[in-house]
């Protein structure tokens, strides 16, 4: 391995770097720079500057009125954040409801990026289709800047309908990732 000094604050390591024990710590605002492999015009960054794993409390809300109380044993979601990408999953169950009305919203660990787009994820439900008569493939859609996602469903004749809270009840279950 060749080590050389570059300028007053940099070191160049030739032939790689092996660390037998410990971590590599990067100062805030810095990361791993992949610009040496610049491939596509229009890219905005080649710096991997964030990684995080954690849990968050999952919430379901009624967009218009009423409340949805989550089962405390089934309201913890997990997430992995790599750069700007967040992969979240949960197994959330309802404990009780009090006259929920309007669209179903499910809380996310981070707000959706405000970049002019929306993002989709598949969802599995249990009990929801029986009580609400909203049958079909459920999915969640997060929009610009929202800290929650809207629950939608598809039928054989309609795509992207927003799920309504009216029929939700105890033990209804939402799972996504």
PLM regions: where:
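Intrinsic low-complexity, repeat-rich intrinsically disordered segments enriched
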Residues: 1-67, 89, 94-98, 129
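A general structural signal for short secondary-structure junctions and capping/turn motifs
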Residues: 23, 78, 139-142, 167-168
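Domain-scale recognition of soluble eukaryotic interaction modules
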Residues: 144-177
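Generic beta-strand structural signal
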Residues: 19, 81, 142-144
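Terminal beta-strand-rich extracellular "head" domains
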Residues: 71, 92-153
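A broad, low-specificity signal marking well-ordered, structured residues that form hydrophobic/aromatic
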Residues: 32, 54, 106, 149, ...
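Substrate-binding and catalytic surfaces of secreted/luminal carbohydrate-active proteins
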Residues: 86
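Surface-exposed ligand/attachment interfaces on beta-rich extracellular proteins
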Residues: 37-46, 55-82, 91-114, 159-171
């Amino acid at each position: 391995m060749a080590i050389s000094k570059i300028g007053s604050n940099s070191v160049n390591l030739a032939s790689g770097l092996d660390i037998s024990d410990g971590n590599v710590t990067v100062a805030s605002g810095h990361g791993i720079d992949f610009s040496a492999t610049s491939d596509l015009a229009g890219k905005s960054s080649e710096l991997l500057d964030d990684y995080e794993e954690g849990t968050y409390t999952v919430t379901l809300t009624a967009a218009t009125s009423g409340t949805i109380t989550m089962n405390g044993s089934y309201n913890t979601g997990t997430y992995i954040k790599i750069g700007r990408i967040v992969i979240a999953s949960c197994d959330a169950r309802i404990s009780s409801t009090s006259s929920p009305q309007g669209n179903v919203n499910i809380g996310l660990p981070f707000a959706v990026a405000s970049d002019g787009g929306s993002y989709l994820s598949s969802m599995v439900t249990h009990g929801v289709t029986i009580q609400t008569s909203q049958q079909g493939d459920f999915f969640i859609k997060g929009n610009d800047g929202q800290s929650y996602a809207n629950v939608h469903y598809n039928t054989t004749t309609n795509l992207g309908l927003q799920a309504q809270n009216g029929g939700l009840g105890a033990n209804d279950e939402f799972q996504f990732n």
